[in-house]
Amino acid sequence: MIIMTYYTFVKPFFIKAVTHLHVSSGTSVEEEVDLPFQRDELNYPTIFASSLKGAIKSFLLKEYSNAREIIYKVLGSDENPDEASLGSFLDAVLFAIPARSIGVSGLDEAWVYVTTYELLRKVKSLLESMNTLSATQFTSLLDAINNILQESKNLIISDNAASVILNEDFYVELSNIQNEYIQSLLGDMLIENSTYNQSNQNSQSQGNHLVKPLIVLKDSIGREVINRSLIRVRRIKIKRSSKTVEEGGLWSEEYVPVNSLFFSSFLARGSKDTAYFADCILRKTRYLILGGKETIGKGIVELRWLND
C-alpha cells in the first residue's frame, strides 16, 4: 500500500535561549508589563510561527545572499505575498524553562529545568501530527514523553530529591523516575548535544544523566512556577541633552531566561529547491537573532536539530 504524505521534509528542532529572549506580543494595557512575551491559549510563553519564520527568513537572507531566490521560494517572497510558500514553521511550544531552586532534601542545584504535563502534551500532539503528515517518524522522543505522561505526580528526572522549593515560594514534593532511557534522551535534547540520533539508542550518551534535573509539574502549580521564572525589566529613554527621562520614555519588557527551551519544526513540500534549502541552508544554521533586542545583548538563540 502506498501512503501519500503531505510534507516531504519535516525538521523538528529545539530553540535554546543563549541570552534572555523577548518575543513581544505587542503593547498591552491589561498585562503586568507593557511589552509582554507572546503567550499561547493557556497563557504559557510561546513563539508564534509568524515571528519565528520572519526571524529565520531575515537571518538567512543576510547570511546566504547568493541563495535568495531559493529562500524566497521556500519561505515566501516579499514581492508576491499572495503566493504560497513551500515551507512553514510550527508555533514554538515551551518545552522547559529554568527555575531557581532551594534544595530541601539533597537537591544541590542553583536552578533546575521545569515543565508541565500540559506542555508535554502539546509537544506530543506536534510529534503525532508530524508523524501523520510525513514519512518520517519521531518515535523516540514521543515514547519518552508518553512514559512521563503516564504519571500524574510532580516528577523529577535525574535526581533523587524528595522535595524542592522553586522560585522561592513554591514547595513541591517530588517522585523520582528511574528510567535511564528517558534520562539520556532528555539529557541530549536539553543540554549536552546539538542533535540526538534516534536510530542509535545504544550511543555513548545512553548512560548519561541530565546536566540539570528536569522537574515535571502538575498544571495547577506549574504555570505559576513558570510565570515566576520570567524576567521583567523596566527600561527608560534618556534625553541626551538634559540626561533626564523623555516623556513617555518609561516602559517594561518581559523576557524568558537564558537556557529556556522551545520546540518547533520546519515543514515543507517536496522540490529540488526545498531539498537544498532544508539540508544545505536551514540545517546548517545554528545561531540566529529572534525577537530583536540584539543591540542590548538580547535575543540570541541556538537551534538544536533532531536527526531524522
UniProtKB/Swiss-Prot annotation:
Main location class: cytoplasm
Annotated coiled-coil segments of the chain: none
Cellular component terms per the entry's GO annotation: cytoplasm
Cellular localization per UniProt: Cytoplasm
RNA-binding as UniProt keyword: no
Taxonomic superkingdom: Archaea
UniProt entry keywords in alphabetical sequence: Antiviral defense, Cytoplasm
Record Pfam families: RAMPs (PF03787)
One GO BP: defense response to virus
Similarity comment: family membership: Belongs to the CRISPR system Cmr4 family.
Self-association state and partner proteins as the record states: Part of the CMR ribonucleoprotein complex, consisting of crRNA plus Cmr1/Cmr2/Cmr3/Cmr4/Cmr5/Cmr6 at 1:1 and possibly 3 Cmr7 dimers. A Cmr2/Cmr3/Cmr7 subcomplex without crRNA can also be isolated. It does not cleave target RNA.
Function: CRISPR (clustered regularly interspaced short palindromic repeat) is an adaptive immune system that provides protection against mobile genetic elements (viruses, transposable elements and conjugative plasmids). CRISPR clusters contain spacers, sequences complementary to antecedent mobile elements, and target invading nucleic acids. CRISPR clusters are transcribed and processed into CRISPR RNA (crRNA). The CMR complex degrades RNA complementary to the crRNA (target RNA) within UA dinucleotides, generating 3'-OH and 5'-phosphate ends.
Identification of the protein by name: CRISPR system CMR subunit Cmr4
Gene that encodes the chain: cmr4
